[in-house]
């Protein structure tokens, strides 16, 4: 195994994004490449000019909260009042639903970070003669909602170059298109702090586009004029922010609102106009996050006890496991067992589940093999939500295990080391070289080294 020097490390790391054609915001792909975006912007223009009611429907995770924040901030900065609804996980379920539509009487509805699976809700809106614009980034299923426009890079006939972008990025591009249509004077780079937060929280791969947005966004957060980020910076007390600060500290705080209570708490925090309201919201988020950790530990232990090491996947369930926690537990067990994990909470005979897997497994395709058993499902390649009758859980588990057995050779990631590292060269300059090419995430993984003849003095679990 080759020895790694400071010079060699810097050379390897910088080569990863040496020829990035999108290293500047001015050179990123145009919003015009999205299917339906011109139809959508003209409809929004019509609504603005006629004073028509506009309702934004978001989602309760960080990406959905940030997507909603961007839309509200964008319209508010123009002096245009819009309504918004962020579904409560426990009252409404996920995204645009019939329950949500029951609360909308007229106007134009715009979804952010959801909507691509909302077929029944779209029918209800059509019955009410309410136009629907869907902005989403989740996988497109067979049953496409009825909408005036669908802005989603994962549509087969969408020409946008990058398919793996988060919901907030789609919403941001939509706002940029509206700005262009209406000739508004708004600096779209002012949203990079929010975009950075959403991209990392939603575990998007560090493609050339995402890398540029997050890299610039991390700097933007550090110098942000938003009261929320100013307060978070004062708590973190760091000169340089890295992706782990977002992924393991900031994002979990914000996610705790939608997981444990109501996502509007996190939304209000991001939209805070003064230090006092930001402080008040953050105090609630800290309390919810602390409660989340307690519940998470209990469910993780119970799920661990139910798992079978011989199975190809972790598929476990129990009555009344907290719905807001099972996604984190699935992620934790997927990492520790190095296999896909499906965690279900059963209430009144219905099993609602969250699934997580590493980058080699396509969960959406995997779950599709058992689609005949499901009441509904949706998500990404590596994260998904699903529901089915409790009585169908054993058969679902059997199908999942059989399907994964066919793909056993790609079941888990292996660590690939860059080389052997002498402990003596791990000094501030060396660490600075690693930090200098932040952010790290999928498709731009953190460097792994082999270290010989060293003793572990201290370890710490984060997140």
Regions of interest found by a model, annotated:
Residues 91, 112, 329-335, 449-453, ...:
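Short, solvent-exposed secondary-structure boundary motifs
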């Amino acid at each position: 195994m080759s020895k790694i020097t400071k010079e060699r490390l810097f050379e390897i790391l910088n080569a990863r994004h040496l020829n990035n054609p999108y290293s500047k915001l001015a050179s990123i792909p145009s919003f015009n490449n999205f299917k339906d975006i011109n139809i959508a912007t003209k409809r929004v223009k019509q609504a603005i000019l006629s004073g028509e009611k506009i309702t934004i429907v978001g989602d309760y995770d960080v990406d959905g909260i940030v997507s909603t924040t961007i839309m509200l901030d964008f319209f508010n900065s123009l002096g245009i009042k819009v309504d918004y609804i962020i579904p409560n996980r426990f009252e409404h379920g996920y995204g645009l639903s019939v329950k949500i539509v029951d609360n909308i009487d007229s106007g134009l509805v715009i979804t952010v970070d959801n909507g691509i699976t909302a077929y029944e809700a779209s029918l209800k809106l059509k019955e009410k003669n309410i136009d629907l614009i869907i902005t989403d980034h989740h996988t497109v299923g067979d049953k496409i909602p009825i909408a005036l426009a669908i802005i989603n890079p994962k549509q087969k006939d969408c020409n946008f170059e990058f398919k793996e972008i988060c919901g907030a990025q789609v919403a941001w591009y939509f706002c940029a298109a509206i700005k262009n249509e209406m000739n508004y004077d708004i600096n779209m780079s002012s949203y990079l702090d929010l975009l950075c937060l959403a991209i990392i929280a939603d575990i998007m791969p560090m493609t050339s586009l995402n890398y540029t947005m997050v890299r610039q966004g991390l700097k933007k957060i550090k110098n942000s004029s938003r009261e929320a980020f100013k307060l978070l910076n004062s708590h973190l007390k760091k000169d340089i922010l890295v992706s782990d600060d977002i992924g393991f500290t900031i994002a979990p705080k914000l996610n705790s609102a939608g997981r444990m209570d109501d996502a509007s708490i996190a939304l209000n925090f991001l939209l805070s106009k003064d230090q006092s309201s930001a402080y008040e919201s953050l105090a609630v988020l800290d309390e919810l996050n602390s409660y989340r950790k307690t519940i998470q530990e209990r469910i993780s232990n119970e799920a661990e006890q139910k798992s079978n090491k011989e199975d190809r996947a972790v598929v476990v369930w129990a009555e009344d496991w907290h719905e807001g926690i099972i996604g984190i537990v699935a992620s934790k067990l997927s990492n520790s067992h190095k296999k896909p994990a499906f965690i279900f909470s059963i209430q009144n005979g219905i099993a609602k589940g969250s699934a997580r897997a590493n980058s080699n497994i396509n969960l959406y395709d995997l779950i599709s093999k058992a689609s005949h058993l499901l009441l509904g499902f949706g998500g990404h390649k590596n994260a998904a939500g699903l529901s089915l009758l409790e009585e169908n859980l054993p058969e679902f588990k059997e199908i999942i295990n059989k399907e994964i057995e066919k793909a056993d050779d790609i079941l888990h990631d292996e660590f690939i080391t860059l080389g052997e590292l002498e402990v003596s060269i791990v000094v501030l300059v060396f660490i600075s070289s690693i930090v200098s090419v932040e952010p790290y995430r999928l498709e731009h993984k953190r460097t792994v080294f082999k270290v010989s003849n060293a003793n572990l003095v201290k370890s710490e679990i984060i997140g």
